[in-house]
Amino acid sequence: MKVCVIKTSSMGDIIHTLPALTDAQRAIPNLSIDWVVEENFAEIPHWHSAVKQIIPIALRRWRKSPFSAQTKNEWKSYRSLLQANQYDAVIDAQGLFKSAFFATRLANGIKHGYDRKSIREPIASLFYDKKYAISYQQHAVERIRQLFAQALSYPLQKEKGDYDIARHFISTDSIEPYVIFFHSTTRDEKHWPEHEWRNLIEKVTALSVQVRLPWGNEKEKTRAERLAVGLSHVVVLPKLSLHELAEQIANAKAVVSVDTGLAHLTAALDKPNITLYGATAPTLIGCYGQNQHYLTANSMGNITSDQVFSELNLLIK
């Protein structure tokens, strides 16, 4: 069976789709999946063995210069690649107008998606041939698993979903024990105060456990350097690709993170993780997987380093 999956962004949403692929692969012999995904995240679907081809889309970049020659040529190439195959099923796991209009409607095959009451943008359901009522009152991973099971006609198993990518990143080398702190995210209100990060780093390094600080842009690099200054057993990592970052996560003792896509990557790699949430409720969209822990408060500033260390110490002993 050849299936086209539409899930273009964001990092967390793409990662949330992986357990559904595992379900489908185990239920359907010879399953082959092509995946339409934003170019910045194209590396992630490659990690799953069910995915045979990536169809990159660049809506975020194209909309900045929609009438340029480059955009027109890239759109033509994208559309040609998307329409090169006849699919047994086209599944829009995004459920947005942009995914339905720019991807689902163009793909060849019976189009499956959420019904109008099951998605944030009901207009998207107009582009689907088959529509499914799937409750919002469950984690996003479970919604996607149910969508795939109904679209591809297999019984959904009761076990917790399996991302099935961690084994690709585990190292057999002897490594000094370390933890990773994902200290940066896109929205200011989701950041944890830097003095709390510093206090936590001091507590962890006192146990002879190294702390590694990744970053993705210059602002995040500067923050990492501020957190590390004057402290021993702290490493500001170099700029890493997603694959390299996944290797770092997979071989860590544990992770502490703010609300970021990299927290979901940590969950997908079956790594113990403490995610810090302020006003955001993690029940339906938080990290999904084994050994995932949350600390919540009405404001990030109300979560203390003592609270985090108490939880983390149990994970790194």
Where in the sequence are the language-model features?
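Catalytic machinery of carbohydrate-active enzymes
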Residues: M1-K317
